[in-house]
Amino acid sequence: MRMTFLSYLKQWRGTAKEAFENVSIVAKFLCLLHVTDRYIISTTHVHGPSMLPTLNLTGDVILAEHLSHRFGKIGLGDVVLVRSPRDPKRMVTKRILGLEGDRLTFSADPLVGDASVSVLVPKGHVWIQGDNLYASTDSRHFGPVPYSLIEGKALLRVWPPEYFGSLR
């Protein structure tokens, strides 16, 4: 009987070791996925009227990279993912129209009239706007956005397939 118990113990130990190794591999893979998604490249579903006609109202899936803004490689015209200054839990997709030191003149409210406002983008900030001026809450409403709120740069649209390609 003692031999049987020891043989079961050895068998259990081998099975437990194999299970632990498999769980370890899965955990490492999940960590790699998280790091890739958070710090390198990810897909993001974006929707709403603010980026019409560049992005669809009903939604697009875009591929966004998360390295450029960390190395100061964001430029005028880039479409970026930004944490909303009004609600940091929310992400917004906008186009960069001004970098630090730029002076911009824009229509205060395009629905009301031609009154224009001029602003200087301060150091460490960018000016973002939606492509649809009539349906976008952007820097015209909350001012220049700190560079630290930029989460990524949109590379291309991957869904729907008929619109696959660059966002320029």
Curated annotation (Swiss-Prot):
Active site (UniProt): S50, K94
A Gene Ontology molecular function term of the record: serine-type endopeptidase activity
CDD domains linked to this entry: S26_SPase_I (cd06530)
One biological process term in Gene Ontology: signal peptide processing
Free-text disruption phenotype from the record: No visible phenotype.
Transit peptide (first-last residue): 1-47
Gene3D superfamilies according to UniProt: Umud Fragment, subunit A (2.10.109.10)
NCBIfam families on file: sigpep_I_bact
Function of the protein: Catalyzes the removal of transit peptides required for the targeting of proteins from the mitochondrial matrix, across the inner membrane, into the inter-membrane space.
Protein name (record): Mitochondrial ATP-independent inner membrane protease subunit 1a
Natural source organism: Arabidopsis thaliana
